[in-house]
């Protein structure tokens, strides 16, 4: 007996039991996120960013991210939450891995349509927005907001 794939939930499959489904699609003003996994131990997403759009300038107090650029070119703006306003930029192309520990200020801008994978600790709402092109208000430091 077969069944249609369904959105995967927050809960991990029981030991020895596979979980088959479709990712949760989260529309964003800059593109979309496909949530592949979100458990109490880890999260995995694919982010698709439209050319010319960028995510918030942000940092996380607890969340640790690793990103893999699958396609396109992305301009990263990076800094430290301990040194406001001190940023450096670099362009990442397909095949690049970027590690963002807690406290790393970061922003990604798609120089062309781009897609990257993000594997992280599970704190998806741990975000402090410093700037945002889409008018989404950021919480003060120490309070959680919404991702991206």
What are these regions (language model features)?
Residues 80-103:
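Short acidic-glycine-tyrosine-enriched beta hairpin
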């Amino acid at each position: 007996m077969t069944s249609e794939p369904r959105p995967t939930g927050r809960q991990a499959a029981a030991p020895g039991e596979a979980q088959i489904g479709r990712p949760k699609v989260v529309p964003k003003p800059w593109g979309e996120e496909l949530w592949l996994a979100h458990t109490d131990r880890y999260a995995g997403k694919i982010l698709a960013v439209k050319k010319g759009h960028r995510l918030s300038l942000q940092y996380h107090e607890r969340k640790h991210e690793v990103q893999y650029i699958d396609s396109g070119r992305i301009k990263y703006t990076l800094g430290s939450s301990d040194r406001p306003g001190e940023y450096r930029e670099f362009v990442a192309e397909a095949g690049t891995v970027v590690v963002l520990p807690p406290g790393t200020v970061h922003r990604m801008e798609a120089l062309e349509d781009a897609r990257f994978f993000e594997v992280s600790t599970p704190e998806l709402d741990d975000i402090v927005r410093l700037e945002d092109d889409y008018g989404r208000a950021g919480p003060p430091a120490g309070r959680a907001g919404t991702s991206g």
